[in-house]
From Swiss-Prot:
Signal peptide limits: none
The protein, known as: UPF0251 protein DehaBAV1_0135
Pfam families named among the record's database cross-references: DUF134
Family under the similarity heading: Belongs to the UPF0251 family.
Domain of life: Bacteria
Highest classification ranks of the organism: Bacteria, Bacillati, Chloroflexota, Dehalococcoidia, Dehalococcoidales
């Protein structure tokens, strides 16, 4: 019997979800898909500079799982940058902060609208 799936936690959905090389029509590009969890792993480790153990704890996953996710994300980003591919950030099964675990396409996973003051 396989182990139960552990829901991954992210702080927010990335504000920009698509990148492509300038000057090349989208129809001529190959595309790499980066999951939302992989983008969060990159953010925690490479942007915020957290240690893998800290980042894994924040995402509610084991350190080896975090490491595999980070390597996968780095490979996809490097492939897109060096080989002129588009990069789409979407998909995955995760929870945003304390919201229930779900897929990005469901309404409960969308970011809260800004509060008006």
């Amino acid at each position: 019997m396989p182990r139960p799936y552990k829901c991954r936690r992210i702080s927010e959905i990335p504000k920009v979800a698509y990148y492509k090389p300038a000057g090349i029509p989208l129809s001529m590009l190959e595309e790499n898909q980066l999951s939302t969890e992989e983008a969060e792993a990159l953010r925690l480790k490479d942007l915020l500079g957290l240690e893998q153990a800290q980042a894994a704890l924040q995402m509610n996953i084991s350190r080896p799982t975090f490491q595999r996710m980070l390597y996968s994300a780095r490979y996809k980003v490097a492939d897109a940058l060096l080989n002129g591919k588009a990069l789409r950030i979407e998909g995955g099964v995760f929870e945003i902060d304390a919201r229930p675990c779900c897929q990005r396409q469901t309404p409960s996973c969308q970011p809260d609208p800004p509060k008006q003051t």
